[in-house]
């Protein structure tokens, strides 16, 4: 997919400028080959994938990597590239405010299909761009009394693995 190609271009650009490149898993709990069938092949069906995903999470837990206090360590002046050079453009789009309250997560199953009920968390865009913690949402969903929200997050990881293993 596009993002893999983009990351390779950025890595090359940084290397050419003698800047180290670090790649971190941050938008999923399990990536690439961490949830595969016993024969090492990727899943093509959601249900067995989700069962293995849940079993692994229950066994290993959800790691916590708090980063809120690290933002000031980022460089504010960067002459290597700008956001436009890596494909970003300015937008006037206003995003919906997300809601990850216990009320939303606990009532997700009964309200998610009714637009008038305001029953979704509206975190899709934030998850996509990594501005909200996937691990925190997974942990919160797991601790709730409703597994539907957790299964939606697992579906997101399943879909990303499908895109990785079967890019056509």
What are these regions (language model features)?
Residues 48-167:
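Glycine/tryptophan-enriched, flexible segments
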Residues 1-57, 145:
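Trp/Phe/Arg-rich N-terminal binding region typifying the photolyase-homology
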């Amino acid at each position: 997919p596009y993002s893999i190609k983009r990351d390779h271009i950025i890595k090359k650009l940084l290397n050419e400028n003698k800047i180290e490149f670090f790649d971190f898993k941050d938008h999923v709990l399990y990536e690439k080959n961490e949830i595969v069938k016993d024969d090492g092949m990727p899943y093509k069906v959601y249900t067995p994938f989700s069962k293995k995903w849940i079993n692994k999470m229950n066994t290993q837990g959800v790691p916590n990597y708090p980063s809120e206090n690290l933002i000031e360590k980022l460089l504010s002046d960067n002459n290597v590239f700008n956001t436009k050079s890596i494909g970003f453009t300015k937008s006037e789009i206003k995003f919906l405010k997300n809601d990850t309250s216990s009320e939303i997560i606990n009532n997700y199953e009964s309200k998610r299909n009714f637009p008038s009920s305001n029953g979704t968390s509206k975190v899709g865009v934030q998850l996509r761009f990594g501005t909200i913690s996937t691990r925190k949402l997974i942990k919160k969903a797991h601790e709730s009394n409703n597994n539907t929200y957790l299964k939606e997050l697992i579906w997101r990881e399943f879909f990303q693995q499908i895109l990785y293993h079967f890019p056509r």
